[in-house]
Amino acid sequence: MGTNQILDEIREVNLSYLLLAQQMLREDRIAAMYRLGIDEDIADILVKLTNSQLLKMAGSNMLLCRFRFDDSLIAEILTSHKQDRALTQSHAAILMAGLPAEKIS
């Protein structure tokens, strides 16, 4: 996979992520902020972005979304194949809810 193809893939992922984030925020702001791991300032910015701004942001050479966990325990919980999947997901959600929302530096 060449550099240009990787950049195209990043652009696609970014645009999909931004569009999904906007849709989620418009439908249920509080739940979206929780699921996206963002604070109100970032939510306000995302909702107000025009199509032109979305495309400009998506064209960045870095991914705009990232893993919300640095803890191997959460990764392990999310990937485990235990029978009670709902309980496992709830446990991971509780652990991730304790993580701070992202701030713009």
Curated annotation (Swiss-Prot):
The keyword Ion transport does not apply. The C-terminal region contains a putative helix-turn-helix (HTH) motif, suggesting that this region may bind DNA. It is found in: Cytoplasm. Coiled coil: none annotated. SUPFAM superfamilies: Flagellar transcriptional activator FlhD. This is Flagellar transcriptional regulator FlhD. GO terms for molecular function: DNA binding. InterPro entries: Flagellar_FlhD, FlhD_sf. Belongs to the FlhD family. Keywords: Activator, Bacterial flagellum biogenesis, Cytoplasm, Disulfide bond, DNA-binding, Transcription, Transcription regulation. Functions in complex with FlhC as a master transcriptional regulator that regulates transcription of several flagellar and non-flagellar operons by binding to their promoter region. Activates expression of class 2 flagellar genes, including fliA, which is a flagellum-specific sigma factor that turns on the class 3 genes. Also regulates genes whose products function in a variety of physiological pathways. Homodimer; disulfide-linked. Forms a heterohexamer composed of two FlhC and four FlhD subunits. Each FlhC binds a FlhD dimer, forming a heterotrimer, and a hexamer assembles by dimerization of two heterotrimers. GO terms for cellular component: cytoplasm. Pfam families: FlhD. One of its GO terms (biological process) is regulation of bacterial-type flagellum assembly. HAMAP family: FlhD.
